[in-house]
Curated annotation (Swiss-Prot):
UniProt membrane topology term: Peripheral membrane protein
Protein name per its UniProtKB record: Phosphate import ATP-binding protein PstB
Binding locations of ATP: G41, P42, S43, G44, C45, G46, K47, S48
Similarity comment: family membership: Belongs to the ABC transporter superfamily. Phosphate importer (TC 3.A.1.7) family.
MF (Gene Ontology): ATP binding; ATP hydrolysis activity; ATPase-coupled phosphate ion transmembrane transporter activity
Organism: Haemophilus influenzae (strain 86-028NP)
Described purpose of this protein according to its UniProt entry: Part of the ABC transporter complex PstSACB involved in phosphate import. Responsible for energy coupling to the transport system.
Length: 255
């Protein structure tokens, strides 16, 4: 369905283990460039495990292992000699709960940039404004950049985390249930932002909210018990699923 030319991430025969527990089983999947792909499925199905394998977050924890291939622009991230910090710069991540750093709004954005680039003060100011503008936050914080990131509302904090992620100019942005802790208005702003971000980034989102998947995503992957059950364009998955288990899940017949 997605050609090689359209592919940003190609997953081949991916298996993942938590010690002896086989959490992901022979996953094969292509993630399209400059599109939003949603992972859906019941709790414990493996969708967050799959998402976090894309930038090797699992290496922060003991006794976790991935085998197979996760090719980003043709390079296998599981075997590459690329520095792990560079991988996580290329494949940025925003977590379920907003996690601003204990520093100013300005430094929340500038911190990661300083790790990879030496910018003049003027250029750094431009980058901070650019990232906050991209995250639809600049107009709300431009007069209080010196204030702590913790001083913002939950929805603003999550947009700050998105701005922090895109400030280092990744090619992929991973969002792990980014709206689950937010109120409906903040959720709407994040969803609008996700739709806009695909102009510049490949976006992958894990969500329990199937309505959110239909609103935000171009492609949807349904997972169950560590297996990829069905993958396709979002409208097709929700309107005309080909697999009975997919239909049962989206119609609420299974948890």
């Amino acid at each position: 369905m997605i050609s090689l030319q359209e592919t940003k991430i190609a997953v081949q025969n991916l298996n993942f283990y938590y010690e002896d527990f086989h959490a992901l089983k022979n996953i094969n999947l292509r993630i399209a460039k400059n599109k939003v792909t949603a992972f859906i499925g019941p709790s414990g199905c493996g969708k967050s495990t799959l998402l976090r394998s894309f930038n090797r977050m699992f290496e922060l924890y003991p006794n976790q292992k991935a085998t197979g291939e996760i090719n980003l622009d043709g390079e296998n991230l599981l075997t590459t000699k690329m520095d792990i910090s560079l991988i996580r710069a290329k494949v940025g991540m925003v977590f379920q709960k907003p996690t601003p750093f204990p520093m100013s709004i300005y430094d929340n954005i500038a911190f990661g940039v300083r790790l990879f680039e030496k910018l003049s003060k003027e250029k750094m100011n431009e980058r901070v404004e650019w990232a906050l503008t991209k995250a639809a936050l600049w107009n709300e914080v431009k007069d209080k950049l010196h204030k702590s990131g913790d001083s913002l509302s939950g929805g603003q904090q999550q947009r700050l985390c998105i701005a922090r992620g895109i400030a280092i100019k990744p090619s992929v942005l991973l969002l792990d249930e980014p709206c689950s802790a937010l109120d409906p208005i903040s959720t709407m702003k994040i969803e609008e932002l996700i739709t806009e971000l695909k102009q510049d980034y490949t976006v992958v989102i894990v969500t329990h909210n199937m309505q959110q998947a239909t609103r935000c995503s171009d492609y949807t992957a349904f997972m169950y018990l560590g297996e990829l059950v069905e993958f396709g364009q979002t409208q097709q998955i929700f309107d005309r699923p080909k697999i009975q288990r997919t239909e049962d899940y989206i119609r609420g017949k299974m948890g």
